[in-house]
């Protein structure tokens, strides 16, 4: 047998002998500390970043690592990120095995190829959607820590020359500086697609929503001073039900177009093209062009008021009315469905009532959305948030499955596989029945999350279990039936949510 000294000399060769004094037989030389940290993931030395870091940056990076360790729990942790990535890798492997299983079972069931193909495609699509959502959630968890590091941490984290940790921050600083210079010259603001910007001169993070106003979506024009005329209406004129009045009969109208249509009834002279034309639409040839009209809010201190240092004018009278009512008036219109939301503009109430009570997209935090893209945008911003199913949709299915299961207690006939995505009250019920002879797979909702309990990564629970998670996944049920495992008793699983 070879001695320990011989093994060390054989494995490491001349590189080990050069870094070691003659006569030394220690195999745990500090030269290979970086290699040891790569082999042991749980070792705390992985945070030292000893691999591939220049000696000049070692102290600076170590100072930033110590700073990150003292940040709140929501700060980015590389070990947690590694756990999350390994978690999703395990789920992808499970889905890959499921696809292999479906390919192998393709020739066993004849006569129902179209039905099985649609069901298998829906199964794979829902599991892929679950994986994508977890990936978006993991990426979204980096946003709070990146914003905190750019605003407070010095050194390589602020995009200085020689930065080795966040090199893209330097580009954001350059863009932010260019945007600030353009604003000083009166040019249009530069809107980044990024959620955060870094201001080098003031040293703080500027969020994207601070650069826009919620009242005017068409904002973006920066007219030079003197190129437009500022008009300011009084409060009584803004809140008046009618702003245009007939000079003959005195009838009031909300729009000037309605007034022009009304004037046709007072004589033929009001039916000409000149009388029906929009005012100030055509300028007289040879005359100077008229100044553009912009409007000011009469409320002092408002950003839309002409006395404000960052004055932003309103384009039309309708914009003035809507802005003043939304910002400076009481909300007197209440939704007749939810009796919770209040609005000051009747148009906003009508828009809300179109989807009120139909928020079928629910997040695990309890927030509801009327559109799926809004839900996914919310999930991408908040760590650990995942789609859920509204309780009002799952309660009837839970009661139906319980009644159906009690009536089929001893029946061992042809069964089917059902995916129960109900609420927490029926989360412990099994959703399988023995046999898969007809190959039917039933879906109650669009999401069928896989079983997350099959892989445990050192106690990290970055993706909390939702209230609709079942104790058995679609992948496990298909494996059990395909491998010929003994089916469970019908008395234990009495739920069928396919009908």
UniProtKB/Swiss-Prot annotation:
Disruption phenotype: Hypersensitive to H(+) and Al(3+) rhizotoxicity, reduced induction of genes such as ALMT1 and MATE in response to acidic stress, and impaired Al-activated citrate exudation. SMART domains: ZnF_C2H2 (SM00355). It holds the Pfam family zf-C2H2_STOP2_C. The keyword Ubl conjugation does not apply. Keywords: Metal-binding, Nucleus, Repeat, Transcription, Transcription regulation, Zinc, Zinc-finger. Changing residue 10 to N: In strain: cv. Est-1. GO terms for molecular function: DNA-binding transcription factor activity; sequence-specific DNA binding; zinc ion binding. Changing residue 60 to N: In strain: cv. Est-1. Residues 1-31, 390-436 are annotated as: Disordered. It is found in: Nucleus. Signal peptide: none annotated. Probable transcription factor. Together with STOP2, plays a critical role in tolerance to major stress factors in acid soils such as proton H(+) and aluminum ion Al(3+). Required for the expression of genes in response to acidic stress (e.g. ALMT1 and MATE), and Al-activated citrate exudation. This is Protein SENSITIVE TO PROTON RHIZOTOXICITY 1.
């Amino acid at each position: 047998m070879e001695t320990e000294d011989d093994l060390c000399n054989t494995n490491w060769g001349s590189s080990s002998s050069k870094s070691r004094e003659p006569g030394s037989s220690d195999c745990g030389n500090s030269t290979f500390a970086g290699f040891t940290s790569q082999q042991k993931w749980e070792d705390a030395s992985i945070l030292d970043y000893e691999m591939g870091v220049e000696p000049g940056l070692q102290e600076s990076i170590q100072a930033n690592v110590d700073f990150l360790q003292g940040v709140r729990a929501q700060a980015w942790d590389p070990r947690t990120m590694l756990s999350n990535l390994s978690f999703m890798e395990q789920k992808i492997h499970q889905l890959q095995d499921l696809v292999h299983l479906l390919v192998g079972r393709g020739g066993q069931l004849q006569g129902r190829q179209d039905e099985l193909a649609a069901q298998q495609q829906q199964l794979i699509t829902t599991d892929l959607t679950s994986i994508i959502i977890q990936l978006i959630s993991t990426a979204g968890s980096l946003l709070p820590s990146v914003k905190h590091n750019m605003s407070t941490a010095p050194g390589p984290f602020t995009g200085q020359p020689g930065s080795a940790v966040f090199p893209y921050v330097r580009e954001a600083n350059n863009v932010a500086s260019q945007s600030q210079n353009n604003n000083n010259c009166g040019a249009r603001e530069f809107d980044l697609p990024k959620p955060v910007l870094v201001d080098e001169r003031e040293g703080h993070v500027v969020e994207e929503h601070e650069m826009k106003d919620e009242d005017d979506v068409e904002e973006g024009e920066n007219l030079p001073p003197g190129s437009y005329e500022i008009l300011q209406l009084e409060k009584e004129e803004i809140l008046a039900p009618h702003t245009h009045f007939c000079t003959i009969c005195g009838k009031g109208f909300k729009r000037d177009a309605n007034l022009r249509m009304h004037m046709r009834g007072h004589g033929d002279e009001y039916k000409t093209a000149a009388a029906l034309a929009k005012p100030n639409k055509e300028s007289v040839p040879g005359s100077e062009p008229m100044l553009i009209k912009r409007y000011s809010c009469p409320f002092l201190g408002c950003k839309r008021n002409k006395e404000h240092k960052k004055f932003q004018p309103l384009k039309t009278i309708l914009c003035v009315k809507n802005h003043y009512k939304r910002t400076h008036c009481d909300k007197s219109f209440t939704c007749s469905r939810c009796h919770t939301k209040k609005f000051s503009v009747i148009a906003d109430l009508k828009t809300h009532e179109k989807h009120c009570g139909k928020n079928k997209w629910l997040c695990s935090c309890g927030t509801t959305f009327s559109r799926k893209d809004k839900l996914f945008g919310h999930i991408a911003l908040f760590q650990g948030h995942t789609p859920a199913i509204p309780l009002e949709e799952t309660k009837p299915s839970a009661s139906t499955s319980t009644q159906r299961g009690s009536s089929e207690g001893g029946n061992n006939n042809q069964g089917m596989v059902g995916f129960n995505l109900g609420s927490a009250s029926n989360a412990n019920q099994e959703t399988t029945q023995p046999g898969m002879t007809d190959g039917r797979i039933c879906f109650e909702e669009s999401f069928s999350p896989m079983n997350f309990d099959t892989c445990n990564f050192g106690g990290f629970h970055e993706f909390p279990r939702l209230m609709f998670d079942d104790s058995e996944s679609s992948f496990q049920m298909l494996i059990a039936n395909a491998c010929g495992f003994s089916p469970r008793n019908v008395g234990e699983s009495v739920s069928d949510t396919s009908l």
